[in-house]
């Protein structure tokens, strides 16, 4: 392999693709999760209990789950740039439209429609990156992509808190300004996507002929060794036990990602009631700054050492243990520090997980597998927010719900160790089938 050709190609991709993809995901995550900040004002204006808020937060995932796999199947047929552009334009319109709701039912409907519009975006981007990046660079690429999500909280939470201060401007509530102003960028970027992204390396005019040839040959060689590949269709994903085991792990991890993210400002406000909404949003953003750091370090170290198992399983298990300590800590500062580390470690496995997954699946079956895994994980978003809200209404505390999250993370970490070891073995031996191993 020509090291200069390898380095120059990857560097060009990192400059051209990754920053743009990070911005797209940053906007996506802000629009999906800004309801957590809006709730600081919106719940009172719409007379919503914690359980009703949980329903509004969770109903997004009903449609998101239903349309996830079909969306990714369509993406493989019409091309990534067209479909991702469509997703962003429609979700931008709906996200901004949430500023018009007058009742909890209208909010439920708009959140449901937001899930329809956004379905397929995350797995679509993951599939897109797997079509460009060789295995040796994939975990780092995935970590940079998901840093966009963590940055959405680092930047988006304080930004959303600031927008709430527009309350009363032109007679409009702050949370309505929040939905309106944060929905517009998605619409505009959706148009840019169509003209900026290329569907495949072969079509990338910004790569030289030699770079295009090398990258295409490298990816084709790796894909030929992949268990679920171009010679399978989307139905293969539903029949492969390995895909379902990966789905279980991602579901357990999602209890932490979704459960904590959607309620973090409310949790912080509950223990720091004297703080302003802006300061609450800042305190809620700090854990995601650590998530950015942990994801990059864990992803890069995994690529350099070519080790997946410990990088996948250990952070989750430690995150679960730290969350349990935070729950029972009597010191608020210590509890907050432990919560920060919990969030960071929970997110740290993200690039490793998708590197392991995309080392196993490619093609139409791969796109469907990625979408299926993501859809199953989002069941946590459907079920857990209403349950978490109900627990808060009944017990006046989130502790019982957070214990569930901690146990899910510990169990998920144990599964991650097993999956990581099996994946390392299969990649090393270049096996052609995974179904016999599960």
Residue ranges and their predicted role:
Residues 67-79, 294-307, 392:
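Helix-to-loop junctions at the C-terminal end of transmembrane segments
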Residues 76-88, 303-316:
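Cytoplasmic membrane-interface "Motif A"-like loop-to-helix N-cap segments
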Residues 35-36, 235-296, 350, 354, ...:
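Extracytoplasmic gate region of multi-pass secondary transporters
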Residues 66-105:
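Conserved MFS/SLC helix-loop-helix module at the cytosolic interface between two early adjacent transmembrane helices
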Residues 306-356:
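C-terminal transmembrane helical hairpin of 12-TM major facilitator-type secondary transporters
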Residues 47, 79, 100-106, 117, ...:
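Helix-breaking motifs and short loop linkers at transmembrane-helix boundaries and internal kinks
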Residues 140-164, 185-186, 374-384:
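Glycine-rich segments within core transmembrane alpha-helices of 12-TM secondary carriers
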Residues 110-147:
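Cytoplasmic helix-loop-helix junction between adjacent transmembrane helices
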């Amino acid at each position: 392999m020509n090291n200069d050709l390898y380095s120059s190609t990857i560097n060009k991709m990192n400059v051209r693709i990754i920053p743009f993809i990070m911005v797209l995901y940053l906007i996506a995550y802000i629009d999906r999760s800004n309801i957590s900040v809006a709730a600081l004002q919106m719940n009172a204006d719409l007379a919503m209990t914690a359980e009703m808020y949980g329903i509004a937060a969770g109903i997004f995932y009903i449609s998101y789950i239903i349309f996830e796999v079909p969306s990714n199947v369509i993406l493989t047929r019409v091309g990534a740039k067209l479909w991702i552009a469509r997703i962003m334009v429609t979700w931008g319109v709906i996200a901004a439209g949430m500023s018009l709701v007058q009742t909890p039912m209208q909010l439920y409907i708009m959140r449901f429609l937001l899930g329809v519009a956004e379905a397929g975006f995350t797995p679509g981007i993951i599939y897109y990156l797997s079509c460009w990046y060789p295995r040796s660079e994939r975990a780092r690429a995935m970590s940079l992509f998901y840093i966009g999500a963590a940055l959405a909280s680092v930047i988006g939470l304080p930004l959303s808190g600031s927008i709430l201060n527009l309350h009363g401007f032109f007679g409009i509530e702050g949370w309505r300004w929040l939905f309106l102003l944060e929905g517009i960028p998605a619409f505009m970027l959706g148009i840019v996507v169509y003209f900026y992204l290329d569907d495949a390396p072969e079509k990338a005019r910004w790569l030289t002929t030699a770079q295009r040839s090398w990258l295409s040959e490298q990816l084709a060689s790796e894909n030929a060794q992949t268990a679920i590949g171009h010679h399978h269709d989307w139905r293969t994903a539903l029949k492969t036990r390995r895909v379902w085991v990966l789905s279980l792990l991602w579901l357990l991890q999602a209890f932490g990602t979704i459960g904590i993210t959607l309620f973090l400002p409310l949790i912080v406000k509950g223990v720091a009631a004297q703080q302003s909404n802006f300061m609450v949003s800042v305190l809620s953003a700090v854990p995601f700054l650590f998530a950015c750091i942990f994801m990059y370090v864990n992803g890069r170290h995994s690529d350099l050492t070519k080790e997946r198992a410990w990088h996948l399983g250990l952070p989750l298990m430690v995150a679960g243990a730290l969350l349990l300590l935070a729950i029972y800590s009597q010191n608020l500062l210590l509890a907050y520090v432990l919560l920060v580390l919990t969030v960071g470690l929970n997110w740290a496995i993200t690039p490793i997980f998708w590197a392991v997954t995309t080392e196993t699946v490619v093609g139409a079956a791969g796109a469907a597998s990625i979408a299926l895994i993501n859809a199953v994980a989002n069941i946590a978003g459907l079920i857990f927010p209403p349950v978490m809200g109900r627990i808060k209404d009944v017990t006046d505390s989130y502790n019982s719900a957070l214990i569930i999250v901690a146990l899910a993370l510990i169990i998920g970490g144990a599964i991650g160790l097993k999956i990581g070891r099996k994946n390392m073995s299969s990649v090393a031996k270049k096996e052609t089938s995974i179904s016999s191993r599960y």
